[in-house]
Amino acid sequence: MKLLSAIISGIMAVSSVSATAETDSRKEISTVINAVEYTILVNSDGKTAELKSVYLPHSYAEAEVPTEISGYTITAIGEKAYAGNFNVEKITIGKNIKSIGEKAFMSCNELTEVTFSKGITAIPDDCFFSCPKLETVKLPTSLKTIGDEAFYGCVALDMEIPSSVTAIGANALGMEAATHEEGSTVIHDFLIKGTTGSASEKYALENGIDFIDMKNFMAGDVNNDETTDSADASDVLAEYAKISTGIPAVFTKKQRIIGDLNGDEIVDSSDASEILAIYAKNSTGG
């Protein structure tokens, strides 16, 4: 990288500089495009390539995985390709990408959002390991598997697992390193969103993590007793009172979703009123 930077600084009129070398039995090409340093490995077909490494300048908050570099279509992201790019916040992965290597986005400390296009079938082991600010991940319906520790330590993660996913690896979601002992522990107030009866629900149950099917839950049943009644309304009012007086809230993410009947992202007296209306309707057989 230092040699490449020296070459770039010496040729000011050139916006893209390339160098080639042999590695992994594939031709390696390094180039700079719009101040971003890329290294690719050309596949045997002579048309496609794997993105081996990427260095994004500190000024780059958003990045899109290129569809083409040096005339080659990029079809894969290699192991650790984006790892350690500490300033990038948003990454978009296009439909041309068919595979991703392990640890590809590991320790991207400022990463908050990732968007996948349809085409990816697997998120490998440690793919987003230790991305503490990662919150939004838009997964494609083509996805089949999520590898071991794929989102380990992603404490802010809030995403929905498509029903197409049939296998989820160990510690893939909702887990982080235990603070006072060896091993892993469930992230506080973590919630897995998925489909009832799917691999995501199975994973949540096995690991003691809250689960919700966003298309199939009992609205208002915040105490999880399989009925929406006055007890739920009382719980919602108690939560609202805490929030209003500055006392720490006690509802989990799951309870906040279930208790927010009017969809304004706030659990308050309006929601309690709607819960009571549901209870009254159910009680009278309406």
PLM features: residue spans?
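Low-complexity, acidic Ser/Thr/Pro-rich repeat tracts that form intrinsically disordered stalk/linker regions
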Residues: 14, 18-41
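Cellulosome-associated attachment modules in secreted, modular CAZymes
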Residues: 18-21, 215-286
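Consensus positions within tandem repeat domains that build extended binding/scaffold surfaces
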Residues: 79-81, 101-104, 124-127, 147-150, ...
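Short, aromatic/basic amphipathic alpha-helical patches
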Residues: 199-208
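Sec-dependent N-terminal signal peptides of Gram-positive bacterial secreted proteins and lipoproteins
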Residues: 1-21
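Structural signature of tandem-repeat unit edges
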Residues: 40-46, 58-76, 86-99, 108-122, ...
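GGW-centered surface loops in extracellular recognition modules
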Residues: 32-55, 210
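Ser/Thr/Pro-rich low-complexity tandem-repeat tracts
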Residues: 107, 119, 130, 142, ...
